[in-house]
């Protein structure tokens, strides 16, 4: 096949590339990333994490990255340099944060420089969740109207989500079971993926996306090749071109092999 193997390959982090049973990237996934790079592919993360929530990723992983779409599309980085920020409408930010202050909801907001913080309310449960996932805990500083790229408010109460929805006039709301995410209207994982790929000179057909969660669905659907992890949610699997094995059963490596994005070890040597 004379078609170039080079692609822009985008990975969700948690439960797709980074295993929380291992607290690391599986060895086979590291092998896949190294081989993708040898084939001229660009490797990027595509995540809801704010920039500060990336600091404790394994150095071996960050050394392999060409770019990151953070804050669910709110910040796009090429080799550590921010090339685009999608600012949430200030009125929307004010209304949602004010609602959360009045209704005792915990908020984590993230600014244009990648900083993250809780606002007025804070619970040990959510702080522990951040520590479990990201090995860091956000500080707590009241929002003072600085530009934001991402707001997460925590509630399991659908009525509270329904009360917040009409407060957002120009923003995108991703409702998850507990962590509900606000971004600018034009910011999501899919748009961030396509913008970074274009910046690198790849078109949509040359993008590959790996994901597992509800917030990965659009990215998986829009990518030239969309792959859901075996441990992923049903919506991700339905959107995918291919469902691979679980993260802890070499899912990333097996999918790369299946589509010829990389070659098996022993055939590579002649």
Name what the model sees in each region.
Residues 7-22:
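Asp-based phosphoryl-transfer active-site loop
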Residues 222, 227, 232-270:
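Asp-based, Mg2+/Mn2+-dependent phosphohydrolase catalytic module
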Residues 99, 103-222, 231, 238:
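Conserved acidic, metal-coordinating active-site core of Asp-based
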């Amino acid at each position: 096949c004379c078609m170039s193997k080079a692609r822009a390959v985008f990975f969700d982090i948690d439960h797709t590339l980074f295993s929380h049973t291992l607290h690391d990237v599986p060895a086979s996934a590291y092998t896949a990333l190294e081989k993708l790079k040898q084939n001229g592919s660009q490797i990027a993360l595509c995540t809801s994490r704010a920039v500060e929530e990336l600091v404790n990723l394994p150095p071996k992983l960050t050394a392999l990255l060409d770019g990151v779409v953070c804050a669910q599309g709110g910040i796009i980085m090429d080799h550590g340099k921010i090339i685009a920020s999608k600012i949430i409408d200030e009125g929307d930010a004010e209304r949602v944060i004010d609602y959360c202050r009045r209704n005792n909801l915990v908020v984590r907001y993230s600014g244009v420089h990648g900083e993250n913080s809780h606002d007025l309310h804070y619970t040990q449960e959510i702080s522990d969740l951040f520590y479990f996932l990201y090995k860091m805990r956000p500080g707590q500083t009241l929002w003072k109207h600085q530009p934001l790229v991402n707001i997460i408010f925590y509630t399991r109460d659908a009525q509270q989500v329904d009360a917040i929805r009409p407060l957002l006039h120009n923003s995108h709301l991703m409702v998850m079971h507990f962590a509900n995410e606000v971004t600018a209207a034009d910011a999501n994982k899919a748009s961030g993926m396509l913008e970074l790929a274009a910046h690198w000179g790849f078109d949509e057909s040359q993008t590959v996306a790996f994901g597992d969660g509800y917030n990965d669905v659009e990215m998986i659907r829009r990518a030239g090749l969309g792959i859901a992890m075996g441990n992923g949610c049903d919506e991700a699997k339905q959107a995918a071109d291919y469902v691979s094995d679980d993260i802890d059963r070499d899912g990333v490596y097996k999918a790369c092999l299946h589509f010829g994005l990389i070659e098996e070890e022993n055939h590579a040597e002649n």
